Amino acid sequence: ERVIFVSGHFNNFELMAMHIEKSGINLAAIYRPLNNKFLNYFMEKIRKKYICKNQIKKGSSGTRQLLSLFKKGSSIALMIDQRVSEGILSKFFKNEALTTTIPAQFVKKFRCKIVPIYIERIEDIDFRLTVHAPINFSEDETIDTITLKLNSLLEIMILQNPDQWIWSHNRWK
């Protein structure tokens, strides 16, 4: 059953997608290309070879590609903690933040489940991956309420162990 995996940029977040794909789940993940084009070239190769073969560039063409892969049976991995240029204003740590609606749109269109996933460093090179129970939203929930619930879930993950969260951009800009 295809699902939407959601998380934030926790510790070595790339390991989450790698684990999902290595466990036999066909996965597609959205990524934002690195600003350094030279490094981005190598990072894309590494991601496709070792982490997740279906790496989709962020943007409207990427969203269409993601939709196509989902319709063909792929699950999707999304980092929902990034500041986006399109989305809705939704509460995040008591302030309105522009937030992606992609997970909520997929829930509404396909009645799919959301699976929260969290990774934390235990020590040195040891990590603990927590795959939460799937969330099944009711049909009468709106894009806004689903998005708010996912932001609340992300807050809980962050507050669990704040030093594990890689917060490199301002969500409230």
Stretch-by-stretch model annotation:
Residues 2-59, 85-90, 95-96, 121:
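Catalytic core of membrane glycerolipid acyltransferases/transacylases, capturing the structured
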Residues 22-26, 60-173:
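Non-catalytic C-terminal accessory region of glycerolipid acyltransferases
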